[in-house]
Regions:
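GIY-YIG nuclease catalytic motif and its immediate N-terminal context
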Residues: 1-85, 95-116
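Conserved phosphate- and dinucleotide-binding cores of soluble alpha/beta proteins
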Residues: 88-91
Length: 116
């Protein structure tokens, strides 16, 4: 899986335009998309690849970095209920009492493959 560090920081209320634009641009090329949060996105990417093979995850875009667990959960929660995401798990994550949290976008099964 290709992992891209494209995160921004700051108050999540000031980042919505960036999130919406970025997510829309990336998603249009893939059949599957999933939004998530983690404290270690490299480990999380590996877990998704092993556990969710049917989605054929190809890219992980790290969108947001924050020290606030509430902000990370808020951003994830905003997107996970949408029909165009394949999020199955709902609820708040409690990952670490301190540290950094990352919101990521998973993309799988590219729509426009070039034929060889």
């Amino acid at each position: 899986m290709q992992i891209e560090d494209r995160y921004i920081t700051g108050w999540c209320d000031q980042c919505w335009e960036h999130f919406n634009r970025s997510i829309g641009q990336y998603k249009r090329y893939y059949k599957y998309a999933k939004i998530g949060i983690t404290i270690d996105y490299r480990v999380r990417a590996s877990q998704h690849e092993r556990r969710e093979k049917k989605y054929k995850w190809e890219r992980m875009i790290v969108l947001y970095k924050t020290t606030s667990e509430n902000n990370a959960n808020y951003v994830e929660g905003y997107y996970q209920d949408r029909d165009d995401f394949v999020n199955k798990w709902y609820g708040w994550s409690h990952m670490s009492p301190t540290g950094e949290y990352y919101v990521y976008l998973l993309l799988g099964n590219h729509k426009y493959r070039r034929k060889k």
